[in-house]
Amino acid sequence: DADTYEDLVKFANYALEYAKAHGKKRRVPFSPGILAERSRTLELVERLRDSIEHGFEGFRLVFQPQVNAADGRVIGAEALARWSCDACGEVPPLEFIPLLEESGLIVPFGAWVLHRAMETAARWRAWDPGFVMSVNLSYRQLDEAKLVPSIAEALAATGLPPANLVVEMTESC
């Protein structure tokens, strides 16, 4: 499929990257689909970077209620991130979260999610002082030396008591 030696090597590398990303010990011949997937990945990473640089434009949080099974009361919520891009439309979390992790953008993104979720929880505590907000952290965030000070600063800024925050590891860990 290549016209030049350089293209041949480039396409072989794309196929190798694809094979590694989709399971070990695989042999994958290059196809135009691999190039299309790689192009989409690069475009999404660039758009994620732009969204973050422009104040997390297109990102929003939705909240999954956590309900007490005994009495049906909402006792907390889990913060879930969503992203809509003008050029790409609604991008599923299963697609954009791994790209944030691979690119290192998960660190500023995760800090934004944490702060926004804590702001929301602090407001919702007016209805129920025992309300608990759960936030998922990526393994990349756990490696950050600034994580604990960042959480402490956000707790202080939002007035959310530490007992009202649950920090969880993402499933990708």
Residues covered by each model-derived region:
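Short, solvent-exposed positions on alpha-helices
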Residues: 6, 94, 107-111
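Active-site core of bacterial EAL-family cyclic-dinucleotide phosphodiesterase domains
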Residues: 29, 40-99, 136, 168
